Amino acid sequence: SILAHARGRAERCLILGVAALDGMRLGPFKAVLAHEYGHFSNRDTAGGEFALPVRRSLLTMGEGIARGGAATWYNPAWLFVNGFYRVFLRISQGASRLQEVLADRWAALSYGSRAFEEGLRHVVAREVRFGAHASATLDEVITAKRPLENLYSYKPERPPIERGVEVSVQEALEAKPSPYDSHPSPVDRFAWVRAMGAPGTGASAGDDAEAWSLFPDRDAIERAMTAVVRRNVAQANGIEIAGAAPPGRLDS
């Protein structure tokens, strides 16, 4: 509730992307988590419910004007809504970028500048790679009407072209900043944490272990998340994907 948020007693929920864990070392993983907990420590989530409703209201109002055919340069209502939305977005997103910088600082101080940069690079790259893998996999299983038990370990017959994926990863890492971005550009964030030169107070000898070593049953987690993906595809597109092949069917 709003009252619970104001009192700082609301329950916080941290969502961890399973695909990001693939190939991630424990040290960078801890640094990325420290970034998220940095938001909690700075109470960044306390006022998050205020900016988003304002943004949604402005968008709804603008869409209503546009659908009514009144989104013209001479309509003062449209000019006001459009202009106010842009100003509001610049201010609110600017505040969001500052929150990200301060959370980065917590992460670097806790586990080291190098660990956080490695973790952030990994997360950016995995978002691109997993997006390409998921698209290829879902296109294949939907077209061929195949079951999908584990999205993460599935090997599509036509995997994404590696060169194209590499280019996309590099573009994501070197993306130019915009005043409407909620996060600073990765390049800027790398430069800032490097300038700190923080060794990290929480680094330990076991930081080279795989992040997946923290979880006892990787396959069960991946299958559970695949079930969520299948359900979301069904709800959004009306396409049912089986979770397992029918008895006696051996094709993948």
Where would I find each of the regions flagged by the language model?
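Peri-catalytic and regulatory segments of divalent metal-dependent proteins
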Residues: 1-49, 53
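Membrane-proximal cytosolic interface modules of multi-pass membrane proteins
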Residues: 1-2, 12, 55, 60-63, ...
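Noncatalytic linker/hinge segments flanking ATPase motor cores
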Residues: 26, 30, 53-62, 159-164
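Acidic helix-start/capping segments at beta-turn-to-alpha-helix junctions
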Residues: 51-56, 124-126
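Cytosolic-facing loops and C-terminal tails of multi-pass membrane proteins
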Residues: 69-96, 101, 105, 109, ...
